[in-house]
């Protein structure tokens, strides 16, 4: 009978890089729980597998053994399917999928629906989970990876999220720097009108202002403005930087933005 180690190493030959404790137990019904646990612990100690989630394992390809971890893109889809959770790769991590590589993310950002999940932290990786009330699946792309597929927010949703979660991504200036790289991928005219219902209107206002007044991406900015106009929302004034005093600050009438922050774009 094959050993657990050989069973594990055979899986990548079939294109599988993840497995669960239950799968091992089913494959080795005559083996005790203690023996299975010891066999898996040995493979973890050798760096051949890792466990980002209790009962869920990732097979580490040879080229990643010395690092002791693999990119989250290798296993995230399988892990979230195992948990029965909807998700998408978001914020700076999503922006990198769309070619915005100037701001290299130090953590892998994943958007989920409630209930919240604890961040997954290992010696070589950090996955940060953000919650929103509903995953707008129509605006999530299915991207192919080396080991399968992964869900990534479309460029437009990525752009809006960067401003919705500006406090989590560093600053408005950092978000604007990423938007400068994303701009050529943005076309809000291609989106259905219900997109406005899926995101905070204030984030669209901030995005439109930055595209229009800071990045001078007039055509893209107009596609945002047209989407807002078609939605029928009556825009209210909102601060450019959430949570910061806006007393006495300049007001932009078109976007209904209170300019309470000076934006500085990094050189690209």
Task: Annotate the PLM regions.
Residues 2-86, 183-205, 211-212:
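Short beta-edge/loop segments at beta->alpha junctions of small alpha/beta modules
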Residues 24, 94, 159:
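A residue-level signal for conserved active-site and pocket-lining positions in enzyme catalytic cores
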Residues 29, 84, 99, 164-167:
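Hydrophobic/aromatic-lined pockets within catalytic cores
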Residues 32-33, 102-104, 167-171:
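Short amphipathic alpha-helical segments with coiled-coil-like heptad repeat character
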Residues 51-63, 69-135:
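Short gly/ser-rich loop at a beta-strand->alpha-helix junction or flexible surface loop bordering the NTP-binding
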Residues 140-268:
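Hydrophobic alpha-helical interaction segments
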